[in-house]
């Protein structure tokens, strides 16, 4: 029997729409509850330092109302770690962050920033958080994740999602497969995400070593036309179909 693949729904872009007009709606808290009701295994949200979408209020309320779990993405900065200490998220994912980027552009470079990342991992673990590191599918970065004490990694799938040819997409898929296998051999829990949508998720979902996919933009975009609950259910269905064809 194949291990179930979990779905974490990222609700950042519900907040993006709200912040565009400075209104109280649409409310990410309601979105989190609806996604959870539709079958999401967890809710992911990225509170950026510039507060362009998710606000502190959102994080506090979502943590209170969720029946599943909250995965808080945050930069490795003193301000964000102080906030995490206040919230004590069940799961925290350290991500790179640049103010000028539209979305996260790559994985965390643990090799370059090892001391800072290691201190952040320890601090979060002392809060009781399970820590993951958002990294590129690179063996050296995976080894570094083990070295700094992170039990979980999330593989950046952006290069796969952005590939403009079948050859390039196949190459990036193989990179992710090999990285997932390598990480699993080191006893890491392996998640993945970034840029995944309804037309490219199945090959990723079929990777047996993956534990969870975090998907946001595609689900929120689909929700405009069919509603959030249906969008979540459809993504889950595609992921489950992909797992049916994975050999034990």
From Swiss-Prot:
GO molecular function per UniProt: pyridoxine 5'-phosphate synthase activity
Presence of keyword 4Fe-4S: no
Cytoplasm listed as a keyword: yes
Catalytic activity: 3-amino-2-oxopropyl phosphate + 1-deoxy-D-xylulose 5-phosphate = pyridoxine 5'-phosphate + phosphate + 2 H2O + H(+)
One annotated Gene Ontology cellular component of this protein: cytosol
UniProt-annotated catalytic positions: 46, 73, 194
Keyword line: Cytoplasm, Pyridoxine biosynthesis, Transferase
Pathways involved: Cofactor biosynthesis; pyridoxine 5'-phosphate biosynthesis; pyridoxine 5'-phosphate from D-erythrose 4-phosphate: step 5/5
InterPro entries, per the entry: Aldolase_TIM, PyrdxlP_synth_PdxJ, Pyridoxine-5'_phos_synth
Pfam families, per database record: PdxJ (PF03740)
Binding residues annotated for 1-deoxy-D-xylulose 5-phosphate, in chain numbering: 12-13, 48, 53, 103
Record site: Transition state stabilizer: 154
EC identifiers of the protein: 2.6.99.2
Any GO BP: pyridoxine biosynthetic process
Subcellular location per the Swiss-Prot or TrEMBL entry: Cytoplasm
Role, per record: Catalyzes the complicated ring closure reaction between the two acyclic compounds 1-deoxy-D-xylulose-5-phosphate (DXP) and 3-amino-2-oxopropyl phosphate (1-amino-acetone-3-phosphate or AAP) to form pyridoxine 5'-phosphate (PNP) and inorganic phosphate.
Subunit field text: Homooctamer; tetramer of dimers.
Name of the molecule in the record: Pyridoxine 5'-phosphate synthase
Species assigned in the record: Legionella pneumophila subsp. pneumophila (strain Philadelphia 1 / ATCC 33152 / DSM 7513)
Underlying gene: pdxJ
